């Protein structure tokens, strides 16, 4: 479907970038305007699945699209912080050591198909991401791996979550938040089983079937009937999916069963980033653009739009495949020696990033992490790279999420710098998402942000994001396994002491720079472009992006 074109007339009024508490309708009334019925929203990449907790889903733009269709006990606010969502339910601390939490879902909470939201959904989220049950292609185990058990009576609204002794996860508020809770009854209906009973009793054959459906049943494909969309993709938020368009866009409409404050705009079409963004901005057929800075080239901002550039919580990096030409740390270090990290970061307008285990925050602890060990990899040294390879030629295939002008230029810069070292770098087009292409051996390197994402990719928590390098974690795309690093990552998850965290990071840095599972480049920058008639849109450094409060958005007519 071609994007619609609207005629805009200028109106006088105050431009507001708001938060979830801002009542856009009041502002519109004050400006003598009214809200348009539809908004067009462009996000970083493809919308391939409703389940943003799989490896592919977490790396996609799904979180930007579905933060207000799949709600949870919290959402990520404009600074990346977790904000309690009391419309959904409440969390109370029963005991601090070992950590025990009670999760109470609102009595009013109901999916758009009329089925209640229950503790069964928490059990499924935990089981899928705990690492205890085989078959689930979960992106991360962070936090969930430390849960000892969940007490849930099927069909009820309350769950008690007990953590393993001495594993009181500091950032436990990151668990069971928006987009993490999938509707377990969809799987139960397909398999005709009690999902909670099967998981809590570890029924092996049933768990295998549950995992298969959790991985794939929420794939987004055009052409599904209205009834199938309604039954397979129920919503627990202010918006629900109406349809998937042929070009991959997803149409969201107001959910009439939402029990909280109703969405201001009745319809939002979420578009995957394409090469036509400038044209769409020029003809005013898009209202909000939320993408990595530079990914759409220079992107000229017309007078009828306003633009904000800001740092994300994700790190743009080279993620090396566990097989192929870069399977050995020696060859990865050789490539790193000819990558002009200084020039690449300068082109992005930011400093070089060195941190792997404290990536989400931009503070003194992060700045110090790995700084000394990274020094030899700060500038291009083709002679050292050639010597590290013993003069043997090396061919490297790099892929990335397209279209992205900045990353294409980055690969060109690397190719030019590495050629004198006898390293041939090629820009490879793949027909599968980046993480899958890396798994399948179609590329040797994925150029992406945290977790292989096209967007920020970050949870907003360094302790959670550090699990990208924990063995067995789904988005540990390099397949890295080191028991010492696993122990450090686990220790970081339960430590709030800055001195202890600094000690742990200092212990990890020499190992990680020697074994080189990834090569951090720079903190991904974001561009938020919106019509001057948009209200209540605000930036967000995490993978949920600007969509975190889309139910408050309004476009003045």
From Swiss-Prot:
GO CC terms of this entry: plasma membrane
Membrane topology type: Lipid-anchor
Signal peptide bounds: 1-30
Keywords: Cell membrane, Lipoprotein, Membrane, Palmitate, Signal
Family, as annotated: To M.tuberculosis Rv2585c and M.leprae ML0489.
PANTHER family the UniProt entry points to: MONOACYL PHOSPHATIDYLINOSITOL TETRAMANNOSIDE-BINDING PROTEIN LPQW-RELATED, PERIPLASMIC BINDING COMPONENT OF ABC TRANSPORTER
Record's protein name: Uncharacterized lipoprotein Mb2616c
Taxonomy of the source species: Bacteria, Bacillati, Actinomycetota, Actinomycetes, Mycobacteriales
């Amino acid at each position: 479907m071609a994007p619609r074109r609207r005629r805009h007339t200028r109106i006088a009024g105050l431009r507001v970038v708001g938060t979830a508490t801002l009542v856009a309708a009041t502002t519109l009334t004050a400006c003598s305007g009214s809200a348009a019925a539809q908004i067009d929203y462009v996000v970083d990449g493809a919308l391939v699945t409703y389940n943003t907790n799989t490896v592919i889903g977490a790396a996609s733009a799904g979180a930007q699209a579905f933060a207000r269709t799949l709600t949870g006990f919290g959402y990520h606010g404009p600074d990346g912080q977790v904000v309690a969502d009391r419309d959904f339910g409440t969390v109370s601390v029963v005991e601090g050591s070992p950590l025990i939490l009670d999760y109470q879902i609102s009595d009013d909470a109901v999916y758009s198909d009329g089925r209640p939201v229950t503790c069964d959904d928490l059990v499924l989220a935990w089981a899928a991401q705990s690492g205890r049950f085989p078959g689930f292609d979960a992106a991360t185990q962070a936090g969930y791996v430390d849960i000892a058990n969940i007490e849930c009576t099927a069909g009820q609204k309350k769950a008690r979550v007990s953590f393993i002794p001495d594993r009181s996860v500091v950032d436990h508020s990151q668990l069971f938040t928006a987009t993490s809770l999938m509707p377990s009854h969809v799987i139960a209906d397909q398999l005709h089983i009690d999902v909670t009973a099967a998981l809590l009793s570890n029924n092996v054959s049933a768990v295998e079937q549950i995992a298969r459906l959790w991985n794939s049943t929420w794939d987004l494909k055009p052409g599904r009937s209205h009834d199938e969309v309604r039954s397979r993709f129920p919503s627990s938020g202010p918006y629900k999916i109406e349809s998937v368009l042929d070009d991959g866009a997803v149409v969201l409409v107001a959910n009439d069963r939402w029990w909280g404050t109703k969405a201001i705009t009745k319809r939002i079409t979420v578009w995957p980033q394409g090469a036509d963004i400038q044209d769409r901005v020029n003809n005013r057929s898009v209202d909000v653009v939320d993408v990595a800075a530079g990914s759409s080239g220079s992107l000229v901002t017309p007078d009828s739009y306003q633009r904000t550039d800001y740092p994300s919580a994700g790190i743009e990096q080279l993620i090396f495949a566990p097989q192929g030409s870069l399977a050995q740390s020696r060859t990865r270090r050789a490539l790193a020696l000819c990558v002009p990290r200084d020039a690449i970061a300068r082109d992005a307008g930011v400093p070089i990033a060195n941190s792997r285990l404290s990536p989400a925050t931009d503070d003194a602890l992060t700045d110090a992490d790995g700084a000394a060990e990274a020094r030899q990899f700060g500038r291009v040294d083709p002679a050292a790279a050639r010597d590290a390879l013993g003069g043997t030629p090396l061919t490297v295939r790099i892929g990335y999420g397209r279209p992205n002008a900045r990353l294409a230029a980055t690969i060109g810069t690397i190719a030019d710098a590495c050629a004198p070292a006898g390293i041939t770098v090629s820009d490879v087009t793949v027909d599968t998402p980046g993480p899958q292409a890396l798994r399948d051996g179609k590329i040797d390197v994925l150029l992406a942000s945290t977790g292989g994402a096209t967007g920020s990719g970050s949870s907003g928590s360094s302790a959670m994001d550090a699990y990208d390098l924990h063995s067995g974690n789904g988005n540990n795309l390099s397949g890295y396994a080191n028991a010492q690093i696993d122990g450090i990552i686990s220790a970081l998850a339960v430590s709030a002491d800055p001195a202890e965290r600094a000690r742990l990071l200092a212990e990890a840095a020499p190992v990680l720079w020697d074994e080189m599972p990834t090569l951090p480049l720079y903190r991904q920058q974001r561009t938020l472009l919106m019509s001057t008639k948009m209200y209540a849109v605000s930036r967000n450094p995490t993978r949920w992006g600007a969509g975190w409060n889309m139910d408050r958005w309004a476009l003045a007519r």
